[in-house]
Structures are given as structure tokens and as C-alpha cells.
Amino acid sequence: MSNIITEITKSQLRTDLPAFRPGDTVKVHVKVVEGTRERIQLFEGVVIKRRGGGISETFTVRKISYGVGVERTFPVHTPKIANLEVVRRGKVRRAKLYYLRNLRGKAARIKEIR
């Protein structure tokens, strides 16, 4: 039984996404359905968390929109993600960057890996 589950989950995994980590600035191209139309919406921000493994793996992206922090969680292997671009590689020493929620302005910057 577990072999069947393993095979099904392996077929659902995506291999076309680039490697990214917490601290990286990414652009997520999300497919949005509005009525009968489908369009692509960009969501650019810093990856603050990556959790889980296999088919249930998720990541959270945080951005500031009009002075308000917005966080959005995406499953890594969802077909709703059309594309994912890594804009900048960030150098951080933590796996979960929850402390960024309390920082404002220049204090919330992350050093870039050269």
C-alpha cells in the first residue's frame, strides 16, 4: 500500500523550480482564476519560512504593501505556481525569520550573498 502512495506522490512532485532558502527574495508567478479568465499575478517578497517535506512542503513569502506587511503561504508542489524566480540570495543564520515581522524599514534588510 505504501508503495502505491509513494509512487503517486513522486509523480506529483515538481522539479522545475529553482533552489531557494529562507532569506532569499523571490518572485512567485501565481495563476489566479477570475470568473472564466485565468491570469498570472506576481508576488515578490522575502522567504521567511520553509517547512515540511515531500508533497506537503510549503514556504511563506513576506512583503510590505503600502506600509502593511503581507505574508502568503504557498505549497511548493502546487500547479497554481506558474514560475518562481530567485531575485536575490540572502545571507541569514536562521531557518525561520519571524523576527522580520517586528522590524521596520532599513532594519528589515537582509545581507546579500556575493
Swiss-Prot record:
The keyword Nucleotide-binding does not apply. It comes from the Bacteria. GO terms for biological process: translation. GO terms for molecular function: structural constituent of ribosome. Keywords: Ribonucleoprotein, Ribosomal protein. GO terms for cellular component: cytosolic large ribosomal subunit. Coiled coil: none annotated. InterPro entries: Ribosomal_bL19 (IPR001857), Ribosomal_bL19_CS (IPR018257), Ribosomal_bL19_sf (IPR038657), Translation_prot_SH3-like_sf (IPR008991). NCBIfam families: rplS_bact (TIGR01024). This protein is located at the 30S-50S ribosomal subunit interface and may play a role in the structure and function of the aminoacyl-tRNA binding site. Belongs to the bacterial ribosomal protein bL19 family. HAMAP family: Ribosomal_bL19. This is Large ribosomal subunit protein bL19. It comes from Lysinibacillus sphaericus (strain C3-41).
